[in-house]
């Protein structure tokens, strides 16, 4: 993509309404525009990152055996009355009526609807286990939306729902999602720590939040530093095998949110040098809730013994849009964003340091064509901005690799390659650049 043809509305000044780094940088980098309190338009740069995050989430759900579908944003109020949650949710749930006075709501989550879909079609244990997921926009009418995508009212979420004939099967499904989440966040360059958490209005007695450490996080957390060094399973993990050793390894090291923190246990189990009390950002949460919804909504299957019984369920959420904020909070410096390569809007940016110079233009065009032909996402800054402004923009938007092309270097047949993450630079022959980056 040529920057001269791209829509990238960079802001020179820090927006006054932005309280945290991620919100400030997303607005400055032209990723978002606020349309109402807690509601944002996703501009091209932000949308590219959002789609890359979404795809990683999708790939890891599929790898773990979950099946994608798509449910609507609007739900019937009667479904929520059936489960007993309609009145349990407060004013954060947006309730509306259509022209026929039918009561609807803008779904904050989908346990009721997926249970209704399940009970309409699945009657026998032979169809289980089953895990269905979708990636869809949600709405929760936060009283004080703030911090950009970190606490917005409209947000993109992946929610998965597992169905099993008994508790043992449901816990296996829970473990699959636990491991899938470890892999999902690691692929995005994040160290997300699973922590025991309260279940809240979702229900059940088992839940883990996945927390990215950040001083701007909304949750206080207490961890044993050893958890920071635990290995994440690779892509060859056998989801049909026994995942218990992985789960035990990650849950035997102390890590808890402030809601379920046990001070006495923490002090007795964790050496003082290993204790870390900090803050974190929740990027996902998983729940086992047993028969909470199948009991009230009569989602039964015929078991091996021929009798009907309610299914055991779990739900598993990832805040897809929230992840952009979490990644920026964890990956930035004073100059801007530092995107991990897996989620970067572009992998490489070419900076033409003397637009209009024939040799410089030709070298940039050559690199742009050759890298694009290799399938590399390239943003070519072919604008007439001065070199300093181009450097500042490239650092702000955080593209992992910058290629600086100017007459001085080309006089020696060289261009400069800069790695955004640490500022490391190397001079390369023009002919060697494509091989270096592919």
From Swiss-Prot:
Pfam families: HGTP_anticodon, tRNA-synt_2b. It catalyses: tRNA(Pro) + L-proline + ATP = L-prolyl-tRNA(Pro) + AMP + diphosphate. GO terms for biological process: prolyl-tRNA aminoacylation. One of its GO terms (cellular component) is cytosol. Belongs to the class-II aminoacyl-tRNA synthetase family. ProS type 2 subfamily. Catalyzes the attachment of proline to tRNA(Pro) in a two-step reaction: proline is first activated by ATP to form Pro-AMP and then transferred to the acceptor end of tRNA(Pro). Can inadvertently accommodate and process cysteine. The misacylated Cys-tRNA(Pro) is not edited by ProRS. PANTHER family: MITOCHONDRIAL RIBOSOME PROTEIN L39/PROLYL-TRNA LIGASE FAMILY MEMBER, PROLINE--TRNA LIGASE. This is Proline--tRNA ligase. It comes from Rhodopseudomonas palustris (strain ATCC BAA-98 / CGA009).
């Amino acid at each position: 993509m040529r920057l001269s043809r791209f829509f990238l509305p960079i802001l020179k000044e820090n927006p006054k309404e932005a309280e945290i780094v991620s919100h400030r940088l997303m607005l400055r980098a032209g990723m978002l525009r606020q349309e109402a309190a807690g509601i944002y338009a996703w501009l091209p740069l932000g949308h590219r990152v959002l789609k890359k995050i979404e795809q990683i989430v999708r790939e890891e759900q599929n790898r773990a055996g979950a099946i994608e579908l798509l449910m609507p944003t609007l739900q019937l109020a009667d479904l929520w009355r059936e489960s007993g949650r309609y009145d349990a949710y407060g004013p954060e749930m947006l309730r509306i009526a259509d022209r026929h006075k039918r009561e609807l709501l803008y779904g904050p989550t989908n346990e009721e609807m997926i249970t209704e879909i399940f009970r309409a079609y699945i009657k026998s244990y032979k169809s289980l286990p089953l895990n269905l997921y979708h990636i869809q926009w949600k709405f929760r009418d936060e009283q004080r939306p703030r911090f950009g995508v970190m606490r917005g009212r409209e947000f993109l979420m992946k929610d998965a729902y597992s169905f099993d004939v008994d508790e043992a099967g449901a816990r296996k499904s829970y473990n699959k999602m636990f491991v899938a989440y470890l892999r999902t966040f690691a692929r995005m360059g994040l160290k997300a720590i699973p922590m025991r958490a309260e279940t809240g209005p979702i229900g059940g007695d088992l839940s883990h939040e996945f927390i990215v450490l950040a001083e701007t996080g909304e949750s206080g957390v207490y961890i044993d530093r050893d958890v920071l060094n635990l290995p994440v399973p690779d892509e060859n993990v056998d989801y049909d095998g026994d995942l218990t050793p992985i789960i035990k390894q990650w849950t035997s090291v102390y890590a808890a949110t402030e809601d379920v923190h046990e001070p006495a246990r923490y002090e007795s189990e964790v050496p003082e040098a290993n204790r870390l009390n900090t803050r974190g950002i929740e990027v996902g949460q998983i729940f086992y809730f047993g028969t909470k919804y199948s009991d009230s909504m009569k989602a039964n299957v015929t078991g091996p013994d021929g009798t009907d019984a309610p299914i055991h369920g779990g739900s598993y959420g990832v805040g897809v849009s929230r992840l952009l904020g979490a990644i920026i909070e964890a990956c930035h410096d004073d100059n801007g964003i530092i995107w991990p390569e897996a989620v970067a809007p572009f992998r490489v940016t070419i900076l033409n340091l003397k637009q209009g110079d024939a040799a410089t233009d030709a070298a940039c065009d050559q690199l742009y064509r050759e890298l694009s032909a290799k399938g590399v996402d390239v943003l070519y800054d072919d604008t007439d901005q001065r070199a300093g402004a181009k450097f500042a923009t490239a650092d702000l938007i955080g593209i992992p690799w910058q290629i600086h092309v100017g007459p001085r270097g080309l006089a020696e047949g060289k261009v400069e390659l800069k790695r955004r993450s640490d500022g490391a630079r190397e001079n390369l022959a023009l002919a060697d650049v494509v091989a270096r980056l592919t």
